[in-house]
C-alpha cells in the first residue's frame, strides 16, 4: 500500500469512533448519529453502499475511494452502536 502523510487505518478509525462514543463530546456528529438509532444508521449504510456502487461504475478511483471510506465509517458506527468489536468481525473473515 502506498503511504501518504495522513493515513488512518481501519483500526485507528474504530478506536477514534469508540472514544467518541465513550466520551460523548457534544459537538460530535458521530455521537448524534449513534443517538439516532440503528434504523437511521442502517439507512445511511444503504445510501453509502449505493454511492459506492455508482462511483464504481461512473467515477474515477479517487471518488470511489472516498465513497468506500464513508461506507466503512458508517459501518463502524453501526458496529459500535450494536456493541461489536473489530475482533467480532475479524473472526468472520
UniProtKB/Swiss-Prot annotation:
InterPro entries per the UniProt record, alphabetical: HisE, PRib-ATP_PPHydrolase-like
Q: What is its EC number?
A: 3.6.1.31
Q: Which residues form the signal peptide?
A: none
Going by the record, the broad EC class of this enzyme is: hydrolase
Instruction: Output this protein's name.
Output: Phosphoribosyl-ATP pyrophosphatase
**An MF annotation (GO) of this entry:** ATP binding
Protein's organism: Mycobacterium leprae (strain TN)
- Predominant location of this chain? cytoplasm
**A family per Pfam:** PRA-PH
Per UniProt, subcellular location reads as: Cytoplasm
Amino acid at each position: 500500500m502506498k503511504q501518504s502523510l495522513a493515513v488512518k487505518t481501519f483500526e485507528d478509525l474504530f478506536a477514534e469512533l469508540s472514544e467518541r462514543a465513550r466520551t460523548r463530546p457534544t459537538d460530535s456528529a458521530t455521537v448524534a448519529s449513534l443517538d439516532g438509532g440503528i434504523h437511521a444508521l442502517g439507512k445511511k449504510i444503504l445510501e453509502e453502499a449505493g454511492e459506492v456502487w455508482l462511483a464504481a461504475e461512473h467515477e474515477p478511483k479517487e471518488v470511489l475511494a472516498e465513497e468506500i471510506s464513508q461506507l466503512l465509517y458508517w459501518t463502524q458506527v453501526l458496529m459500535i452502536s450494536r456493541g461489536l468489536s473489530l475482533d467480532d468481525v475479524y473472526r468472520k473473515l
